[in-house]
Amino acid sequence: GRLVDSVDALGLGEDTIIVFTSDNGPTDWPRYYKEGFTPPGWAGELFGRKWSLYEGGIRMPFIIRWKGAIPEGKTNDATVMAAVDLFPSLHALSSAKLPTDWRLDGQDLSKALQGRKVKRKGPVYWEYGGNPGILKPGNPLFESPTNAMRDGD
């Protein structure tokens, strides 16, 4: 609240895009289980935690505010937006110019941020290979495949 209030008090609300998001999934460090504790964090009704490609491990909270340009008090549960889509989407909302030789990963989903329907051009792909001996979920129940893809709604 104080950040948003300060931006508005300075008269910058219509010129400032504010994004609140976080890392994916609550922690699942094995040490918590070994010490008899449930790890901190909660994935709600979603299955999985960090280091898991189940929804509780990859879904991220995301709130965006741009006074006068992004509808207030609305939710969008239909658009699948990955972190890689954030830069192209924010760039499309801005008047900034990119060097012509830059190629952006991700998809511009700025219309979805503005409350309009958008269909992805292609699937979203997650890969979590890493070294399974180092970062393994503390709860074997949350061990997941090393690859996941979502295509369509």
Regions found by a protein language model. Give the residues of each.
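Loop/turn elements at helix/coil->beta-strand transitions in domains of secreted/extracellular proteins
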Residues: 12-18, 58-60, 118-122, 151-152
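Structural micro-motif
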Residues: 59-63, 87
